[in-house]
Amino acid sequence: MPREDRATWKSNYFLKIIQLLDDYPKCFIVGADNVGSKQMQQIRMSLRGKAVVLMGKNTMMRKAIRGHLENNPALEKLLPHIRGNVGFVFTKEDLTEIRDMLLANKVPAAARAGAIAPCEVTVPAQNTGLGPEKTSFFQALGITTKISRGTIEILSDVQLIKTGDKVGASEATLLNMLNISPFSFGLVIQQVFDNGSIYNPEVLDITEETLHSRFLEGVRNVASVCLQIGYPTVASVPHSIINGYKRVLALSVETDYTFPLAEKVKAFLADPSAFVAAAPVAAATTAAPAAAAAPAKVEAKEESEESDEDMGFGLFD
């Protein structure tokens, strides 16, 4: 089958990306640095039926999107984020589920000299199994060691590489000697596009519990501020009413002014013994049903004992 010419290929690519943008309301913009063709094929297979991966040149993706802005102006939000080695993952499924599937397809990778470290690398304290002749190599990297049973032992955990640092030749050699593959590569989500809105992928980690706690915290802050400045809101009005009632009650106690709810408080303040007497009455009211049930249990127990005694006498008659 003859290979299609470049003009036809471009035309088909434009049609494909536009169709995907129309058919799928959600997509990820993903970085594909250090992702090989074999790993990309594995990612496509794992997402089959749930998502579609589309890679391409940035200029072609931007051109296709700009040509479709008249029909879907919200796509303009994607343009500033199409830079570097990026692509799209289109889906109709739950975004968190697809994100987890992408993370599951990351593969461990050895450190290469000159590569930019995507994460911090720490060498744990361990017996390396290397001979004493390598001691100077560890000293050059500032790693404290000792010779234990003829092999080099690292005495404490060592932060070898920081995030964003360029991996040096010595660091890469050491990690390879220790059989440590510190990095993992795969499609990295850079932005999320969801029904016209674009946001950071960290938003996917927000749960309902987080939203609920943040909402309550906001309500408490609003109520506190409104109470201080005397500005009534839905959040502060209940507290304002309670505080107002307390002030009126205090004023009533100190003056001759009274109202039904204040009379009981005044009576207790005038005769504290009445308040003390009221407590046992309430307790007695609560205990009455239990007390009424107790004699019935005692009576039942006595009947049971009498029955047992009768049975005992019957055995020896």
Swiss-Prot record:
The modification Phosphothreonine is found at residue 59. The keyword Ribonucleoprotein applies. There is a cross-link at residue 264 (Glycyl lysine isopeptide (Lys-Gly) (interchain with G-Cter in ubiquitin)). The keyword Plastid does not apply. Ubiquitinated at Lys-264 by RNF14 and RNF25 in response to ribosome collisions (ribosome stalling). Residues 302-311 have a biased composition (Acidic residues). Disulfide bonds: none annotated. There is a cross-link at residue 297 (Glycyl lysine isopeptide (Lys-Gly) (interchain with G-Cter in SUMO1)). There is a cross-link at residue 297 (Glycyl lysine isopeptide (Lys-Gly) (interchain with G-Cter in SUMO2)). Pfam families: Ribosomal_60s, Ribosomal_L10, RL10P_insert. InterPro entries: Ribosomal_protein_uL10, Ribosomal_uL10, Ribosomal_uL10-like_insert, Ribosomal_uL10-like_insert_sf, Ribosomal_uL10-like_sf, uL10_eukaryotes. GO terms for biological process: cytoplasmic translation; ribosome biogenesis; translation. The modification Phosphotyrosine is found at residue 24. It comes from the Eukaryota. GO terms for molecular function: large ribosomal subunit rRNA binding; RNA binding; structural constituent of ribosome. It is found in: Nucleus; Cytoplasm. The modification Phosphoserine is found at residues 304, 307. P0 forms a pentameric complex by interaction with dimers of P1 and P2. Identified in a IGF2BP1-dependent mRNP granule complex containing untranslated mRNAs. Interacts with APEX1. Interacts with FMR1 isoform 6. Belongs to the universal ribosomal protein uL10 family. This is Large ribosomal subunit protein uL10.
